């Protein structure tokens, strides 16, 4: 049984329990493979989980990703992955959240799932009086036309993996090496650049609370990490 590291994160309603795992700073590939294994091994009564991580610098190309949108990767590795969407960048100072949820148990569809994630991000930014919005046909969250959070998801047998990336206090220069999400010239921004906090912990706490509210979850933090080994 996993050791509980802290009290459950509060939610506005009693809800379904979900394990919360803070992975710290990790390379992308081991976490990607771990969430694939978790999703493949899920059974009807497997508890949902939410993983939180900061990744080492990496560009990822989703299933719709076109190599020509990677303009000048330089020393930053490029990985083709199995999420939806185009190309994006992950790096230190960006909060990445992977909700591993059973949509059938939550009784929501994929469209509602995406909308709930976007609303959690919008409500998180409102904590610091940052007015954000969603765009029809372009998943993610935007402030004044600049993208501050990207979504890239995969659903297998009704269960989600991959998730969201939220620019908190990071070097945005690598985004100039790609066409973010497949859009040439798309501007990006961060919480810090918009007058919000620089600390990841402050933003993380608010976002997790908002996600718990949107999905009706009671988050149960655990110190146990998933198996992050890579296949031989």
UniProtKB/Swiss-Prot annotation:
Keywords: Acyltransferase, Cytoplasm, Transferase. The keyword Acyltransferase applies. One of its GO terms (cellular component) is cytoplasm. PROSITE patterns: BPL_LPL_CATALYTIC (PS51733), LIPB (PS01313). It comes from the Bacteria. Residues 44-219 form the BPL/LPL catalytic domain. It is found in: Cytoplasm. GO terms for molecular function: lipoyl(octanoyl) transferase activity. The keyword Acyltransferase applies. One of its GO terms (biological process) is protein modification process. Pfam families: LplA-B_cat. It catalyses: octanoyl-[ACP] + L-lysyl-[protein] = N(6)-octanoyl-L-lysyl-[protein] + holo-[ACP] + H(+). The record marks 147 as: Lowers pKa of active site Cys. It is an enzyme of class 2 (transferase). CDD domains: LipB. Its EC number is 2.3.1.181. The active site is at residue 181. Pathway: Protein modification; protein lipoylation via endogenous pathway; protein N(6)-(lipoyl)lysine from octanoyl-[acyl-carrier-protein]: step 1/2. Substrate binds at residues 83-90, 150-152, 163-165. In the reaction, the free carboxyl group of octanoic acid is attached via an amide linkage to the epsilon-amino group of a specific lysine residue of lipoyl domains of lipoate-dependent enzymes. Belongs to the LipB family. PANTHER family: LIPOYLTRANSFERASE 2, MITOCHONDRIAL-RELATED, OCTANOYLTRANSFERASE. Catalyzes the transfer of endogenously produced octanoic acid from octanoyl-acyl-carrier-protein onto the lipoyl domains of lipoate-dependent enzymes. Lipoyl-ACP can also act as a substrate although octanoyl-ACP is likely to be the physiological substrate. This is Octanoyltransferase.
